[in-house]
Every structure is written in C-alpha cells, then in structure tokens.
Amino acid sequence: MNQQRQSDRIYLSAMDFYGYHGVLEAERILGQPFQVDLTLELDLQRAGLLDDLNETVNYAQIYEQVRQIMEGEPRALLEKVAEEIAEEVLKNFSKIKGLTVKVAKQKAPIPGHFQAMAVEIYRTVTKAYIGLGSNLGNKEENLQKALECLNDGPSLSLRDYSAFYLTQPVGFTEQDAFLNAVAEVETWLTPEELLRFLQEIENKLGRLRKERWGPRTLDLDLLNYGNETIISEKLIVPHERMYERAFVLVPFHEIAPHWIHPSGLSTKQYLEQLEDEQAIVLQVPKESITI
C-alpha cells in the first residue's frame, strides 16, 4: 500500500520579542513581551543528502523577518501579526509549502492566571492556473498589467506565464479578436478569496463587459486550484469548459503540459484531441514579456 509521504519540518521555536501590538492604548505605549513559534513544511531530503544550504531555507533570514514585524509598526490584533508573518515568509521562501505561525502574548492585560494568550494560523501553498483574456483597448498592455498585479498581489506569487496568443471570439463573433494567456501562481488564499482577488484586478484595470460572450477589457478565469474540485454558486473548478477551448489549452499547454484534469487526462492529451478549429496565432513571445 502506498502511503502519502509526510512533510519534513523545520521548527523555529520560542522566539522572544518585545513589541507594541494590541488594542489597548497601554499596550501601544508600554509594550509587552511576545513569543513566536514557526513550523515550516518543505522537502529537506536534498539538503540532507548534499549538506547544502541552498537546498533548504536560511533560519537567520526568517528570524530577521519575524523580528522586524514583531518589533515594528504596532497592530491591533494578533491575527494581523500572524498573517503578516505568514505573508512575509511564504513570499520570500518558495521552498516552503506549508507554514504554522503561533504568536503569543505572555502578559496580556487580562485579569486572571494564564501562561499566554495566543493565535495560531496554518497556511498551505497551492498551485493554481489563471486564464487571461482581453479584446478592448490596448490588449497587450491589459494582460501585462494583469500579470504585474498577480506578481505584486497579496498571499500569492506569480511563478510562470505563457506567451500572448491572438484568438478569434467565441459565441458572439461580431467583435475584435482576443489576446489570451495563462499564468501559474502559488497561493495561500482560499479558492473563494483568490476569485475575489481576481475580480478586484479586473475592476482595478477598468473591466468592461456588457454581455456574456461580448467584448471585455480584461477577463481573469480561475482554471484550477490544486487538485480540488469545487462546484458552488460562485465558482466551478476546474473551469467547466477549459478543455474545449484552444484559446485556453494552447497557452495552458505551453506552461503546464502535464497538468492532470480530474478526468485523468493531461493538458497535452486534451490538446491533442481538441476539436476546436479556432485559429491561434502567437502574438507576443514569452521572452518579450517583462514582469
């Protein structure tokens, strides 16, 4: 019987700091001691075999990031402090695939006897793919700006993206051609929060769309989220028609030919059996796109 391999872990335990986080005025003036514990989940086998720091993470660098947050600008809630630590660590150390952050107030201003008041959060990194499309305004600029927003966004990291492809419209054909691409991100947002963030990017970049198949300034579709299958009023993942459309499969295949759909077929296999005869033209090579 095949058993799923457990994650290797690194522990940064009982890190003590003095900070000014809290809701009460006295906490922000006088400060108090805090204790932080981190559990990092990542593959340590290669580091162990090669005895090479480049194959793991630098504890000192992580400690310094935590210290700057704990001794830096005051936050009202421990929840906020913990989230900022998770964000900073996961953004800067791509080898980490799971992270537990515990932040404790050892002398919280609460009557009674206790060891500490603490918040603990867990964030796991998931790979997701996003389809990008535009056929209004400066289409190339729209996709470029969308990629920049993904690269700079909270709780995710842009890992890869395809070239930009010129494609003919589907459904309502009396409109300009589309420019399409696919991006790969690693995120610790939930699927719902990731969808909300994509909609924020669309709105920020002035999305205009008056009908379902009509022209739009920018369209961002969540194609998949890890290995999850989600069917809800707001979200269907994997995207229900992604494997029927050349404008999705061609750029998707460029960056993830071996991604496996829940049906058991890979992107490459879907592309090989695609019946969509829509013309796809390479418009902007990947090497011409700078993020």
Segments predicted by a language model, with ranges:
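Short beta-strand-to-loop capping motifs
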Residues: 40-42, 134, 184-187, 224-227
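Short secondary-structure junctions
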Residues: 90-98, 151-158, 205
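Flexible, gly/pro- and Lys/Arg-enriched active-site loops
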Residues: 43-48, 127, 170-177, 200-291
